[in-house]
């Protein structure tokens, strides 16, 4: 019985908690950081009225502005990022000392990952550049349903010309 508990504790320490923490860090970057309590107490009818006035021509800009109003990282984000950096530092440490060997691409990737995470803690976040002009793709409406056209659109298969004109 104690062997099972020991294995379960080792599994949690090695795999579960670091992956859960990494998932929390990754998911938290997409969520807005609430700076004051006034934002949380907005009535539901104002949200519904603003949703009805949305201009749908710039959906990408709306998604970015709604998802990231502030670019601050609060204390718990910093704590989670530091813990992930600590876990990655120990996990990516070389087991043996190389003898004047060139660094492998995997080691360079690990170093770049750690540098990126530490830069997220030390550098001030900047909002992404706003794209002023969006080019929309033109889709010609089809007059009648045809199975070959549907297959080519759904599966990406083109078996011949769509129109014989």
From Swiss-Prot:
One of its GO terms (cellular component) is periplasmic space. The keyword Plastid does not apply. Belongs to the SecM family. It is found in: Cytoplasm, Cytosol; Periplasm. This is Secretion monitor. Regulates secA expression by translational coupling of the secM secA operon. Translational pausing at a specific Pro residue 5 residues before the end of the protein may allow disruption of a mRNA repressor helix that normally suppresses secA translation initiation. It comes from the Bacteria. Residues 1-37 form the signal peptide. Keywords: Cytoplasm, Periplasm, Signal. GO terms for molecular function: translation regulator activity.
